[in-house]
Amino acid sequence: MMPGRFSNNRVLVFVSVMVVSIVGLLLLPPITQNQNYHDFADQRTILGIPHFWNVVSNLPFIAVGAAGLRQCRREPAIAVLFLGILTTGFGSGYYHLDPNDRTLFWDRLPMAIGFMAILAIAIEERLDAKTGAFLLWPLIALGVVSLLLWRLTGDLRLYAWVQFFPCVAIPVLFVLYSPKFSGTSYWLIAAALYALAKLFEFYDGAIYSFGSILSGHTLKHIAAAAACFAILRYFQTRQPIRTEVWARETVA
């Protein structure tokens, strides 16, 4: 099979899976926002700042996002990713000052942009460079629409796809297709830290009950920012793998 034909087929399969997964999710009943979500364990006011630690623990996102933008601003998908990380720090900090659905929109919007940007990057680096570049802006638009749809209808189904499809698709891409750049270990570190962040989030209250020092949600922010830093280190240190080797491994 010719390499170009192989590439076209795998792109078609991947895009088809994306479309089918969205349609399948939309066939399920609507998902609404549980209002208990806003009831975080650590609600202390310190230095006049409500929910102090849940607010200030977003500073690492701002630092990582700013560093990424400074170093990677010439590559559109990477720049959008770090812009999403930077604005997540501001959006999440704003949300935690007064947790409610209205402020949660501004927390989730930059995250949706970041999720879609990193999916486009994974497609570009593992599946097909032109497809990844082409899908960047449609995916970003989909992320934005998912949040607008939630605010207009109360339905989180599309946002659920935006958040969780990359968590499934990116590992599959990494398993099935060879890398174009060195540094895959940074992606693995980022994935492990993100999984740890979700674990901290789930055990928010249980962690806070141990001494009432820091809550699980605060630790979630720190672990997630560390995952973003691992991705930053990947882009700072990656080196191209020889094209002919990558092509031979991909076609094999």
Protein language model features and the residues they cover:
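Active-site rim beta-loop-alpha module in soluble metabolic enzymes
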Residues: 148-181
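Early transmembrane hairpin module of multi-pass membrane proteins
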Residues: 3-136, 143-148, 152, 181-252
